[in-house]
Amino acid sequence: MRTAMTVNARVASPKISILVSDLSKQGAGRWGGAVRTFLLAQALERIGARVKIYGFVFGDDPGEPTVSEVPMITVPGEYYPGFIGRSRALLKQLDADIIYALRPKPTTLGLALWHKRNTGCQVILDIDDWELSWHGGDRYRYRPSLKQLAQDILKPRGALRYPDHPLYLRWMESRVCEADAITVHTQFLQTRFGGVKIPNGKDTELFNPQAYDPQLSRQAYGLSDYRILMFPGAPRPYKGIEDVLQALDRLDDPTLRLVIVGGSPYDDYDQQLMQRWGRWIIQLPPQPVTKMPFVVAGADIIVVPQRETPAALAQFPLKLTDGMSMAKPILATRVGDIPEILQDAGYLVEPEAPEAIAQQIRWILDHFQDAQQRGASARQRCIEHYSIEAMSGLLSDVVRSLQLS
């Protein structure tokens, strides 16, 4: 475990329990140490907090963090009514001054507020996604027929027996204000829920381009014969991969390839992309976060082509800071916080604009030395504003404000 680093306004050593709805390999555990759960844990450790991660496991084994030694305590997840007993089992194990509930769900914020009522502990709510955006957002309504309602309640796997059913998510949004503090990671979420904006931090020591040889990376993954555009994440329609592939169709350059790192853990969308654009795609298997810098080292350009949807606006694209920290030229879209994060340290186009993407790819490759200098500026910006250290400083202020309240 790394020694806690000095940050401004260093806090005392509170015990902080991070509460996660699903730590399985289909949930927060699927990306190892790369997701916000583990980034928060790392950042809190660096301000001297004693951190443990608690959560449920729905369906399979818990994922293993690969960059952190923070203890993880898990309880098997279960549908109602069994979930009530599982919740009690988890809460009995909590030993915390502060519960850090991740997302406004019954399995996190609901349990945290219940524990606060019984013990007086303080609750921070972190919101790194708008859960209802996956169910229609503000338009979501649960209006079943009487027959459907009975099935949803009475069947062993009825919809309303799932602890985080969208109806319950909607109810939990009305209780966000009961948390003692709120943290978010995008402007969209801050506008919607309030709170302190704490962008995801990148481990810029791990993601240090000086530590990796791009040629060795290319050789290791069979990329040496191509100029590589890389999307180091799971493809989903709102992430705009199709726009890049259409741009490659326009360029029709056989030396170009789009490398997608990891498939979709949600559906067969990556296979749909392969069926239509397989000539341009090289797909690498999911990588542990400790291997990602070596993978990213092989890229010529990192692409972050988000489309302007509620899901995209709510999310902080971790692949953006992968590229920034590794000093790579970055081609991204003007969506959400991306322009603020990148500023002049990358290349921006409008969303869903394949022709503009194609033109920008050609310009970057034709002026690659200039693009590399811009990549170096991106790394410096990442260190200053989007590193684990920067995240720690912001978290320190939040924790101190609770300790002083």
What are these regions (language model features)?
Residues 1-68, 94, 181, 246-249:
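N-terminal subdomain of nucleotide-sugar transferases
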Residues 188, 201:
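Carbohydrate-associated surface elements
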Residues 19, 222-239, 245-248, 259:
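Conserved donor-binding/catalytic core segment of Leloir-type glycosyltransferases
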Residues 270-293:
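Nucleotide-activated donor-binding/catalytic signature segment of Leloir-type glycosyltransferases, i.e.
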Residues 363, 370-385, 391, 397:
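A short, well-ordered alpha-helix in the C-terminal region of glycosyltransferases
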Residues 56-59, 202, 232-236, 257-270:
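Glycosyltransferase donor-sugar binding loop
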Residues 31, 239, 288-295, 302-324, ...:
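Nucleotide-sugar-dependent
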Residues 346-354, 363-369:
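Conserved acidic donor-binding segment of nucleotide-sugar-dependent glycosyltransferases
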